[in-house]
Swiss-Prot record:
Keywords from the UniProt entry: Aminoacyl-tRNA synthetase, ATP-binding, Cytoplasm, Ligase, Nucleotide-binding, Protein biosynthesis
Protein name from the UniProt record: Aspartate--tRNA ligase
Enzyme class, UniProt record, top EC level: ligase
PANTHER family, alphabetized: ASPARTATE--TRNA LIGASE, MITOCHONDRIAL, ASPARTYL/LYSYL-TRNA SYNTHETASE
Summary of subunit composition and partner proteins: Homodimer.
Chief location bin: cytoplasm
A Pfam family it matches: tRNA-synt_2
Domain of life, per lineage: Bacteria
Length: 593
């Protein structure tokens, strides 16, 4: 029989109506001549009542049912008695008296309970992912994701964007992470790469006169995984011609506002706040600031430059900085042992220690209090905004070490003391980025975003011969949500001359630039318009909207932290015949100790 509606959508408006429902048995309660079944589908759960009073045949069927059996029923919707109403259920006002029932399929006992809050391991749930996805909290993630994509399509279509697919088999180019490579059977020894982003193709579309492009782009990066990363992911990718950075940001804000309204019925305030990269680093110690709470970093370098406390004065003398955060009521809530643990933890950022002071009615208290006179105390209090009962935490070192240290402590302590409004969605633009970033691991300068980013107009000369390109700032912008990068973009370079200068500044020879990006450089000779764009991480956006810790929870079939997939056991070895077709020999090397 044809299904009337979803089980989870049956409500009081259906009272007295005959409905046909199909779904899974969530729970069975047998009272002899009365059996209650909770029937579950993707929209929720409804209670079924089986009784010989309604149908003896249906009662016999109910006696056979077990959890996760697939069931079809037809019955009459009835109001529950007042004492039986379940306010915790969306359908708790009604129940369905079953007149006909049919088992569509039986089921083995699942390896874990199909319910929220189940204690099964992540690995087990991923092995039986199709069962895990039956749980309401997992379905919620996929539904939110779907609403986001529907809002994206609707809004960008209204704004005149064309949905255009770009290739998934393309050329390997250095964009930061390792490429996933695909061997070519037709061209032995040659490889395609799965795209890390559609960056160059969407720029070429602007050169083709498309004007406004978007797609929900699948991207692939062979990198170490963490909570907000997967080897394959989806981004909301867009590119426009003839627009300024501010105009692109306005379109993006409209897109985000539509998504928030259509998914969570939240009206976000427009326009979003904007701060420069430098201001973000100065105030928050990070380029991804969480602005839902205060406790900002305060620079006291000038106050302590001549201090008798040599850790502070020495740091300033060596070109470093001294900054502090004031932890509200921290003097009462953090013990010496707690502070020592924090000091030990921040050593990973290069910090050599953590100085601290408690603010009492009598002034500063703590190991370094003796180094500060009354006037210095007053200046530090004024600069940090500290009050009696607060705890001051200090870091003195190079600017990056200080920012990393106090930036981490700021967020960690805000979480510990419940200073963050978890119901707030705080969007922020971080703009005016450096064009280059120094990679301390590789000991070289790299593009802060990517090699195709346009410098600020007044900084273009820094790419000329004899100038210092690392002084340049970029026409780039990141959109931050609750302390995480939601997406980012820039105005792109649109002339060959400037693009070649940029690549040269990154260490590309003319030959290597043409080898890697020759098709783009050639295209730039043919009248490219001013253009720019942005990409937003769809998986991360969905994760933040459903308030989950890992993007796996909003991806139907994700990889685990080892980049494998327990259900299909991918990746796997392939046959010698397949390798021979690809002209490949495999030499599996043991990992280095």
């Amino acid at each position: 029989m044809k299904r009337t509606t979803y089980a989870g959508l049956v409500n009081e408006q259906y009272t007295g109506q005959t409905v046909t429902l199909k779904g899974w048995v969530q729970k069975r309660r047998d009272l002899g001549q009365l059996i209650f079944i909770d029937l579950r589908d993707r929209e929720g759960i409804v209670q079924l009542v089986f009784s010989s009073e309604f149908s003896a045949d249906a009662l016999k069927i109910a006696d056979q049912l077990r959890n996760e059996y697939v069931l079809e029923i037809t019955g009459i919707v009835k109001q529950r008695k007042e004492k039986d109403v379940n306010p915790k259920m969306k359908t708790g006002q009604i129940e369905v008296e079953v007149q006909q029932a049919k088992i569509l399929n039986s089921a083995k006992t699942p390896p874990f309970d199909i319910e929220d809050g189940v204690s099964a391991s992540d690995e087990l749930k991923m092995k039986y992912r199709y069962l895990d996805l039956r749980r309401p909290e997992m379905l919620k993630g996929l539904k939110i994701r779907n609403r986001i994509t529907q809002a994206v399509h609707s809004y960008l279509d209204e704004q005149g964007f064309l949905d255009i697919e770009t290739p998934d088999l393309t050329k390997s180019t250095p964009e930061g992470a390792r490429d996933y490579l695909v061997p070519s059977r037709v061209y032995p020894g040659h490889f395609y790469a799965l795209p890390q982003s559609p960056q160059l193709f969407k720029q070429l579309l602007m050169g083709a006169g498309i004007d406004r492009y978007y797609q929900l782009a699948r991207c692939f990066r062979d990198e170490d995984l963490r909570g907000d990363r997967q080897p394959e992911f989806t981004q909301i990718d867009l590119e426009t011609s003839f627009l300024t950075a501010e105009e692109i940001q306005d379109i993006t804000e409209g897109l985000i506002a539509r998504v928030m309204k259509d998914t969570l019925d939240i009206d976000v305030k427009l326009p979003f706040d904007r701060i420069s990269w430098k201001e973000s680093m100065d105030r928050f110690g990070t380029d991804q600031p969480d602005v839902r709470f205060g406790m900002e970093l305060k620079d006291i370098s000038s106050i302590v430059a001549d201090s008798e406390f040599k850790v502070f004065s020495g740091a300033v003398a060596n070109g470093g900085v001294v900054k502090a955060i004031a932890v509200p009521d921290g003097a009462n809530n953090l013990s010496r042992k707690d502070i020592d643990k924090l000091g030990k933890y921040v050593e990973r950022f290069g910090a050599k220690g953590l100085a601290w002071l408690k603010i009492t009615d009598d002034g500063f208290s703590g190991p370094v209090a003796k180094f500060f006179n009354a006037e210095t105390e007053k200046q530090i209090m004024e600069q940090t905004g500290a009050q009696v009962g607060d705890l001051l935490l200090f870091a003195a070192d190079r600017a990056k070490v200080v920012g990393d240290t106090l930036g981490y402590l700021r967020v960690e302590l805000a979480k510990r003391f419940d200073m963050i409004d978890e119901d707030q969605f705080a969007f922020l633009w971080v703009v005016d980025w450096p064009l280059f970033d120094y990679d301390e691991g590789d000991q070289r300068w790299v593009a802060a975003h990517h090699p195709f980013t346009m410098p600020n107009e007044e900084d273009v000369h820094y790419l000329d011969e004899g100038e210092d390109p690392h002084q340049a700032h970029a026409q780039s912008y990141d959109i931050i949500l609750n302390g995480l990068e939601l997406g980012g973009g820039s105005i792109r370079i649109n002339t060959r001359e400037l693009q070649e200068k940029m690549l040269k500044a990154l260490g590309f020879s003319l030959e290597s630039a043409n080898d890697q990006f020759g098709y783009l450089l050639t295209a730039l000779d043919y009248g490219f318009p001013p253009h720019g764009g942005l990409a937003i991480g769809l998986d991360r956006f969905a994760r933040l909207l459903v308030k989950r810790d890992n993007i796996r929870d909003v991806i139907a079939f994700p990889k685990n932290s080892k980049a494998s997939e327990p259900m299909t056991e991918a990746p796997t070895m392939v046959s010698e015949e397949q390798l021979a077709e690809l002209s490949l020999d495999i030499d599996v090397r043991k990992p280095e100790d």
